């Protein structure tokens, strides 16, 4: 396997998921809603899920040449999700004995869009067989529509599991990730257990876009089912630790009467923890989102109260298996979501270690 690594810094500064998700995310099919509306998709997704959980079976089809894969990921952040995801993908591809070349570009979330667009256009000009990207902003969507309309490159959209309704006749090759609504609802259910008498809370969003809508608005919608919970404030961030710190300070200075803060990402949560310590407000509970290494370390020392932990490597494995199916001429599902587990600081180290072995079964390998 030939590997081309371009590490670039492009910066300018299971749970029951209710049917309301498509109301929160206008213009998208909710994950379960899509699988129910298109039953054959449900069958394919379940088949892929079983393959992901099982040992790899090497490719038997002949390859005349290596496939070419371009990856544009927002990997430059404290959360190790993206780096681990790509590591799991490559290791599973190797186990499947697929011959491939990969070109990687890591950016920051909320990065300079012009620079990001240059990297994406270069990926298309290289005539990659597969392009792995994400969808968070309107500009991302315009580029994706260009790819769907005018390129033979097959598009894998990472970190999104809600198919775009307007693309009904020309969907990407695969949507893959951990369903933001499912994870957010799991956290909402846990907060309701922690505060049976109700509570006041604040929300710290990611940067403006799909992730904030899917994680933040879904959580608020779920908490609104009970009149015992009151949203006191909500702030968008720049999706960084520094902006999480500043937003948490601003929120608490203006609305100090809160019992917990709901954070929409790792970096935002870790910044907010620093603010809570500085203000002497460590009585306020705060969650993480994703359960990567940084969050689990924070839980171990008691800084973070809870998180929803992605079985991280599921999605990297799913991408590799979907490509294998494609090479073999099999029908690939449109969407795949990996598994979650809620983790709290009260959980035993032994229990968390078992979850880590499952979540990082490839990405922790040397």
Swiss-Prot record:
PANTHER family in UniProt = D-ALLOSE-BINDING PERIPLASMIC PROTEIN-RELATED
Picking any one GO molecular function of the record gives: carbohydrate binding
The organism's taxonomy opens as: Bacteria, Pseudomonadati, Pseudomonadota, Gammaproteobacteria, Vibrionales
Report any Pfam family annotated for this entry: Peripla_BP_4
What is the role of this chain? Binds to an autoinducer molecule. This complex then interacts with the LuxQ sensor protein.
| Family per record | Belongs to the bacterial solute-binding protein 2 family.
Choose one Gene Ontology CC annotation of this protein and give it.
periplasmic space
Its recorded name reads Autoinducer 2-binding periplasmic protein LuxP
Q: Which UniProt keywords apply?
A: Periplasm, Signal
Please indicate if the UniProt record lists Signal as a keyword.
Answer: yes
Q: Which residues form the signal peptide?
A: 1-13
Superkingdom of source: Bacteria
């Amino acid at each position: 396997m030939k590997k081309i690594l371009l590490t670039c810094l492009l910066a300018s500064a299971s749970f029951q998921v209710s049917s309301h998700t498509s109301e929160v995310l206008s213009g998208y099919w909710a994950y379960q809603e899509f699988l129910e509306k298109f039953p054959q998709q449900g069958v394919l997704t379940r088949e892929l899920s079983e393959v992901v959980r099982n040992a790899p079976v090497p490719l038997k089809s002949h390859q005349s040449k290596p496939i070419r894969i371009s990856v544009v990921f927002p990997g430059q952040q404290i959360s190790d999700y993206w780096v681990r995801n790509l590591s799991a993908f490559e290791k599973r591809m190797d186990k499947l004995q697929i011959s491939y070349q990969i070109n990687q570009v890591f950016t920051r979330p909320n990065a300079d869009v012009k620079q990001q667009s240059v990297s994406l256009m270069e990926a298309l000009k290289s005539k990659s067989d597969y392009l792995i990207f994400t969808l968070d902003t309107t500009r991302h969507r315009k580029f994706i529509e260009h790819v769907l309309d005018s390129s033979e490159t097959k598009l894998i959209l990472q970190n999104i599991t809600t198919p775009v309704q307007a693309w009904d006749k020309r969907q990407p090759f695969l949507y893959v990730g951990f369903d933001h609504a499912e994870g957010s609802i799991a956290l909402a259910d846990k907060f309701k257990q922690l505060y049976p008498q109700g509570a006041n809370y604040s929300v710290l969003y990611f940067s403006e876009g799909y992730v904030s809508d899917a994680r933040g608005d879904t959580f608020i919608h779920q908490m609104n089912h009970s009149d015992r919970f009151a949203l006191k404030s909500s702030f968008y961030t720049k999706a960084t630790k520094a902006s999480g710190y500043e937003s948490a300070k601003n929120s608490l200075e203006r609305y100090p009467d809160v019992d917990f803060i709901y954070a929409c990402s790792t970096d935002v949560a870790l910044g907010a923890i620093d603010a809570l310590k500085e203000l002497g407000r460590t009585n306020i509970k705060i969650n993480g989102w994703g359960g990567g290494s940084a969050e689990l370390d924070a839980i171990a020392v008691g800084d973070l109260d809870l998180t929803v932990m992605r079985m991280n490597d599921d999605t990297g494995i799913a991408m590799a298996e979907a490509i294998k199916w494609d090479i073999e001429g099999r029908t690939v599902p449109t969407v795949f979501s990996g598994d979650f587990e809620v983790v709290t600081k009260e959980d035993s180290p032994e229990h968390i270690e078992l979850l880590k072995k499952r979540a990082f079964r490839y990405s922790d390998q040397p």
